[in-house]
Amino acid sequence: MEELTKLIIKWHHDRNLIEGSSDKDQVLKLMQELGELSDSVCKGKDVKDDLGDMMVVMLNIMERQGISMED
């Protein structure tokens, strides 16, 4: 999981999603992903991708705030 986390954070930096974005933008993205998760749950669909998308956005917010998974 640690290596995957590092790769996701690198992906964010490579696409300027840390310096070129804001916490507000990322929280709005997280809420969008939560809506997709809610829709999947209500429809009885698989939620693995929705949860993964939320984790990616949360890792972005954590990186912006200087918080690690160990914290």
Regions found by a protein language model. Name each.
Residues 1-71:
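Flexible "arm" and connector segments at domain edges
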